[in-house]
């Protein structure tokens, strides 16, 4: 409900970002950028009403009638009422009567539980329904299975009374442009879903207000002035919240308000207007300001804490439900660029920023570095716990120095002298972080001083860039580490949390710290590693600016929101010294933006810089004319002042020494869950009517080169074990390629359950042959379509219920059989080596009717003895089919030739790169990070990297055919 969404074209941005992201071809549509005019009445130039058309996933086009918001439907006398409206109003009335009838001591706990129930129904209940509808089309499939929208006249609807009730309810609400019988099932399902949403949302809000009433009171010894200020601030926040909701509904209408794009899309242009231009996710961010206004008016910490809990739950709903659906629906990966001929491949490769494989490894000149003008690909990032690498000097020194800082902080006494030292240390690091780093960047912008220094000693610009990232990274972390240490020294644990505003100060301070963390994460997501480290000071990037994420709303989010945490520390500590550090930090940050970033951006991008961000434009439109003129005068005054200070600094700018390094990130341990979940299954009572001989599974796949015979002749076995296997009529072992699709042919009785399913398991997972006691973890396919609410379980069905006459049975039985085929591929496979089996299960349960022959998934190791590893061509030929399997053989992802670049989805979904690096490790014994696969971008480049890595590591590898010591070359 936080965004308006529609199909059609989207409005172009003004072009915005304070630091450009490297190698960004285009700005992807983001949730906050997507708003739709909805299904409200539109008019063309002649004043004639325009229809809104919807489109179902199946391609059906229909007219979307006009609907109204839930409050108008329920409370407006002009709107027609139906039975569901009466039910909702009655339930709301029960809530109000309950508040009136409960004893005083029970009101608060009872309504706290009631509100938490409705909030869980909203975020968990509706979230679960929408998640399943988005991924599996569950709600529509429920409607199809129950046939509640099928006309009873056909004789196929088992619920004719329910059909008439729903028909009357919906047609009462939509008197025009709507026919219940002719509307698509997706639209009718959405309308029924809306009524459930109306009930939950209304009860959620009303129960919250009643809980606030139950908790409300006036603090002891509160003066009249404080009471007036508290109520005034609360009313302002509530009115602001009301405006946000009304303006958001004006923009998105009912279609997006009720998550209509989970069911169908509308053919209409996207707009970017109103509150959606002010803040990201306005319905879930500033749209909850009223909760805190009500908390102020109630003067209750209980209401405040339950408001924070509800707000956090709403953000979880956004992250886990809405954003994944928006990305899937509106931000699909762009179509891949296919190569036309070998010449174009070569030309494209030379222009790429990915590592390029030379024609021969011997042609490389180790002492003649290449000075590429473009930025290097981001493979080994610095930021984030997931990127912590103790083999890297930057990370190791960060952890050691950080540990030292906090050890000194904890072990030293909090005397005035030590407090002074810690505050002075924090101030020095802040000055270095803003002034020192600013001076380095200014010289780099004007004279390329940093890069020139490294080129002077024969290094490349890429090496200068890497060293700069380490310097900036350590300076940043040391700045904040020293600030946290100073806060620790100045903080005194409260003796009484209930005294005065102590608790409120801590809550607000924690909120501001959280805001700064969110702002930093948003900035990093928008800019990437390149923009975060000011990459356009070091490399010539594209002259076009793109604005997305938080930069859609703010030109410099670090100017205010990026320092919210330091002011949160001021609130928590109530210390004058920390207030001084906060003022110093804010002043230096503003100066850095004005004197370092702004001149460089103007020089680099000129007039393409956007003057006003989305929030600024919205505020200017809302201001009266006198205030607009005052705003312009204030801006001019600040500009003149900054120009004067800049001229003064230019005349006497000190040279600051390069600083100390630190950055601490806690190591994260990866815990692998046991890949199976134990379940309790019950044997079906109707199994007696089925003969297990009628069930069978036959497996077919792409054969892999088996190493079994090689292992037998290795000399490690006894004499008898070295002899060839005497199979005595048994079939050859099944060994399939890693990641190749596996076809399963099944047979079952003609009267088999339509909910039968086939699952893929490790042989060692199940000890029982009668019941599968382990979850398939999504690796299963139904035998028949339309039997499950989950549409993904039908992906892979080839044929179903093809009759095999009894005359064609090999076992001589006289009964006809049903047969079918399914194909397991992609996420339905195990992406590892091992021995596996398929199991045929009965009637949606875990009773096993048949088990396939066990088969092995094996990655053939590259034979370095027969084929020289230094030959990239042979490596390419061995690697190419494996890479295609890792990419699911999807034509939009998998390459058709070794030179063709990978599809863009490889960049977005990390599982594909992880599959490839696992295969490379097994084939060649070389371990790469997944980012290497993304950076190389083709089999050709990856093969060259493997050869180069093998050559580098060769002196440390034990060869198969000789000693590890060097040998003389043969003449």
Curated annotation (Swiss-Prot):
Residues 1-85, 131-195, 245-277, 322-397, 441-482, 528-562 are lumenal. Its main location: endoplasmic reticulum. The keyword Nucleotide-binding does not apply. It is found in: Endoplasmic reticulum membrane. The keyword Transferase applies. Residues 107-109, 217-223, 299-300, 419, 504-506, 584-971 are cytoplasmic. GO terms for cellular component: cortical endoplasmic reticulum; endoplasmic reticulum membrane; perinuclear endoplasmic reticulum. It is a multi-pass membrane protein. Pathway: Phospholipid metabolism; phosphatidylcholine biosynthesis. It catalyses: a 1,2-diacyl-sn-glycero-3-phosphoethanolamine + S-adenosyl-L-methionine = a 1,2-diacyl-sn-glycero-3-phospho-N-methylethanolamine + S-adenosyl-L-homocysteine + H(+). Pfam families: PEMT. Its EC number is 2.1.1.17. One of its GO terms (molecular function) is phosphatidylethanolamine N-methyltransferase activity. This is Phosphatidylethanolamine N-methyltransferase. It comes from Aspergillus clavatus (strain ATCC 1007 / CBS 513.65 / DSM 816 / NCTC 3887 / NRRL 1 / QM 1276 / 107). The lineage of its organism: Eukaryota, Fungi, Dikarya, Ascomycota, Pezizomycotina.
């Amino acid at each position: 409900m936080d965004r308006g969404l529609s199909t059609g074209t989207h409005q172009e941005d003004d072009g915005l970002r304070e630091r450009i992201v490297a190698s960004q071809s285009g700005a992807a549509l983001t949730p906050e950028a997507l708003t739709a005019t909805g299904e409200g009445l539109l008019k063309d130039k002649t004043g004639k009403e325009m229809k809104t058309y919807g489109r179902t996933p199946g391609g059906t086009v229909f007219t979307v009638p006009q609907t109204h918001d839930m409050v108008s439907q329920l409370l407006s006398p002009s709107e027609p009422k139906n039975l569901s409206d009466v039910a909702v109003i009655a339930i709301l009335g029960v809530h109000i009567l309950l508040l009136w009838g409960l004893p005083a001591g029970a009101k608060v706990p009872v309504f706290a539980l009631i509100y938490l129930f409705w909030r869980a129904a909203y975020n968990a209940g509706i979230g679960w329904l929408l998640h399943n509808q988005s991924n599996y089309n569950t709600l529509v499939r429920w409607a199809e299975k129950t046939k509640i929208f099928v006309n009873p006249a056909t004789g196929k609807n088992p619920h004719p009374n329910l059909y008439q009730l729903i028909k009357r309810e919906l047609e009462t609400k939509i008197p025009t442009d709507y026919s219940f019988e002719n509307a698509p099932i997706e639209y009718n399902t959405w309308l029924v879903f809306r009524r459930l949403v109306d009930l939950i949302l209304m009860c959620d809000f009303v129960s919250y207000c009643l809980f606030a009433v139950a908790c409300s009171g006036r603090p002891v010894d509160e003066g009249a002035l404080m009471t007036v200020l508290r109520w005034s601030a609360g009313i302002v926040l509530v009115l602001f919240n009301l405006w946000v909701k009304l303006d958001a509904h004006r923009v998105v209408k009912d279609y997006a308000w009720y998550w209509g794009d989970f069911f169908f899309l509308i053919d209409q242009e996207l707009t970017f207007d109103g509150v959606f231009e002010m803040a990201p996710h306005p319905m879930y961010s500033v749209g909850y300001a009223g909760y805190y206004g009500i908390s102020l008016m109630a003067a209750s910490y209980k209401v405040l804490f339950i408001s924070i809990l509800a707000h956090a739950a709403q953000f979880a709903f956004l992250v886990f439900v809405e954003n994944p659906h928006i990305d899937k629906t509106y931000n699909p990966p762009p179509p891949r660029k296919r190569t036309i001929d070998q010449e174009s491949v070569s030309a494209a490769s030379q222009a790429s920023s990915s590592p390029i494989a030379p024609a021969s490894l011997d042609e490389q000149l180790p002492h003649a570095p290449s000075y590429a003008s473009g930025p290097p690909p981001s493979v080994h990032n610095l930021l984030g716990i997931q990127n912590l690498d103790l083999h890297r000097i930057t990370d190791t020194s960060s952890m050691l120095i950080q540990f030292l800082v906090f050890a000194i902080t904890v072990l030293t006494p909090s005397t005035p002298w030590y407090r002074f030292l810690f505050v002075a240390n924090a101030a020095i690091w802040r000055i270095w972080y803003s002034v020192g780093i600013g001076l380095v960047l200014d010289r780099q912008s004007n004279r390329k001083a940093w890069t020139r220094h490294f080129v002077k000693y024969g290094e490349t610009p890429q090496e200068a860039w890497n060293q700069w990232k380490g310097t900036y990274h350590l300076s940043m972390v040391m700045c904040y580490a020293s600030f946290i240490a100073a806060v620790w020294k100045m903080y005194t644990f409260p003796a009484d949390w209930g005294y005065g505003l102590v608790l409120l100060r801590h809550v607000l301070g924690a909120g501001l710290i959280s805001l700064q963390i969110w702002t930093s994460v948003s900035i990093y997501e928008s800019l990437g590693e390149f923009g975060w480290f000011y990459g356009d000071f070091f490399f010539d990037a594209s002259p076009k600016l793109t604005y997305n994420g938080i930069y859609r709303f703010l030109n410099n989010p670090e100017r205010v929101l990026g320092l919210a945490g330091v002011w949160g520390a001021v609130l928590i500590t109530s210390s004058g010294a920390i207030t001084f550090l906060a003022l110093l930090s804010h002043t230096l940050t503003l100066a850095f933006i004005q004197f370092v970033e702004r001149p460089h951006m103007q020089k680099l991008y000129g007039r393409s810089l956007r003057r006003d961000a989305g929030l600024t434009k919205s505020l200017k439109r809302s201001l009266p004319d006198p205030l607009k003129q005052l705003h312009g005068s204030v801006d001019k005054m600040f500009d003149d002042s900054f120009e004067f200070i800049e001229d003064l600094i230019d005349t006497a700018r000190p040279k600051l020494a390069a600083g100390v390094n630190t950055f601490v990130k806690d190591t994260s341990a990866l815990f692998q869950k046991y890949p199976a979940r134990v379940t309790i299954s019950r044997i079906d009572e109707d199994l007696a009517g089925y003969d297990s001989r009628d069930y069978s599974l036959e497996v077919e796949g792409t054969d892999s080169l088996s190493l079994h015979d090689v292992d037998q002749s290795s000399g490690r076995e006894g004499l008898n074990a070295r002899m060839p296997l005497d199979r005595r009529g048994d079939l050859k072992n099944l060994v399939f390629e890693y990641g190749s699709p596996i076809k399963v042919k099944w047979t079952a009785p003609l009267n088999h359950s339509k909910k039968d399913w086939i699952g893929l398991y490790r042989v060692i997972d199940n000890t029982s042959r009668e019941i599968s006691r382990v979850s398939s973890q999504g690796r299963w396919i139904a035998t028949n379509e339309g039997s499950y609410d989950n549409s993904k379980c039908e992906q892979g069905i080839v044929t179903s219920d093809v009759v095999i006459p009894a005359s064609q049975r090999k076992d001589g039985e006289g009964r006809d059989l049903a047969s079918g085929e399914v194909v397991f591929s992609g996420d339905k496979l195990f992406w590892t080596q091992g021995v596996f089996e398929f199991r045929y299960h009965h009637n949606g349960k875990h009773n096993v009717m048949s088990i396939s022959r066990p088969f092995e998934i094996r990655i053939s190791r590259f034979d370095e003895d027969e084929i020289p590893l230094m030959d990239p061509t042979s490596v390419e030929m061995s690697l190419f089919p494996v890479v295609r399997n890792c990419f699911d053989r999807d034509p939009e992802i998998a390459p058709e030739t070794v030179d063709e670049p990978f599809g863009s989805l490889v960049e977005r979904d990390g599982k594909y790169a992880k599959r490839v690096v696992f295969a490379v490790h097994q084939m060649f014994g070389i371990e790469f990070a997944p980012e290497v696969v993304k950076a190389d971008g083709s089999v050709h480049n990856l093969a060259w990297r493997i050869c180069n890595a093998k050559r580098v590591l060769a002196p440390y590898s034990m060869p198969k055919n000789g000693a590890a010591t060097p040998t003389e070359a043969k003449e």
